[in-house]
Curated annotation (Swiss-Prot):
The active site is at K33. GO terms for cellular component: cytosol. Disulfide bonds: none annotated. The lineage of its organism: Bacteria, Pseudomonadati, Pseudomonadota, Alphaproteobacteria, Sphingomonadales. The keyword Ion transport does not apply. Pfam families: AAA_26. The gene is bioD. This is ATP-dependent dethiobiotin synthetase BioD. Homodimer. GO terms for biological process: biotin biosynthetic process. Pathway: Cofactor biosynthesis; biotin biosynthesis; biotin from 7,8-diaminononanoate: step 1/2. CDD domains: DTBS (cd03109). Its cofactor is Mg(2+). Its EC number is 6.3.3.3. ATP binds at D13, V14, G15, K16, T17, V18, E100, G101, A102, G103, P184, R185, L186.
Length: 209
């Protein structure tokens, strides 16, 4: 049976791919992005390959690779591709598998099918990645509420950005979720700086099955 952690976020461009790379590296696991929309500027799998330190065979191929950089349902329509949820079964991996969603939890895949519906079917523990910037309390609590409404297990919330103790504490308290830690924005960002920062902010025990 696949032992997986799903990584979702409160919005796009939060830092979910960087977090996924750090987590996959910390766990010495595998990584999988079910649906990649947009290929010309590189893929999230390419980023994780560069930043995680994992061998290529542990960056598992996407179920769908869409040319158009857009929400998956729109990219699929433009590319004349039909996304079949039956093909979104997590691939086998003999290590912990980090699964990265697209954008936020309620991103549509096809018709009325949302990423949240796929996650609900899998029932893997899910990490919410959130900004620390203004507005994150509302976005984070809405995401937590949407996960709970679908009975998706929540492992905890991880923040990315400058420290905002009050916002981070408030989200964890009101949302009733574990506060896993905070990853700072990194400059330079490479495999070495990410591994060091991730190990300082999180431990493998935070993500134990």
């Amino acid at each position: 049976m696949t032992r997986a952690i799903v990584v979702t976020a409160t919005d796009t461009d939060v830092g979910k791919t960087v977090f996924s790379a750090g987590l996959a590296g910390l766990l010495d696991g595998c990584y999988w992005k079910p649906v990649q929309a947009g290929l010309a500027d590189g893929t999230d799998s390419d980023t994780v390959r560069r930043l995680s330190g994992l061998p290529d065979d542990r960056i598992l191929p996407e179920a769908y690779r869409l040319e158009t950089p857009a929400s998956p349902h729109h990219a699929a329509a433009i590319d004349n591709v039909v996304i079949d949820p039956a093909l979104l079964a997590p691939p086998p991996c003999d290590r912990r598998l980090v699964i990265e969603g697209a954008g936020g939890l309620l991103v549509p895949l096809a018709g009325g099918l949302l990423f949240a519906d796929i996650f609900a079917g899998w029932r893997f523990e899910t990490v919410v990645v959130a900004r620390t910037a203004l507005g994150t309390i509302n976005h984070s609590l809405l995401t937590i509420e949407a996960l709970r409404a679908r009975d998706i297990p929540i492992l905890g919330i991880a923040f990315i950005g400058d420290p905002q103790e009050e916002s981070e504490r408030t989200i964890a308290a009101i949302g009733g979720v574990r506060r896993l830690g905070r990853l700072p924005r990194l400059d330079p960002l490479d495999a070495g700086t990410l591994a060091a920062a991730f190990a300082a902010a999180f431990s493998p025990e935070d993500f134990a099955p």
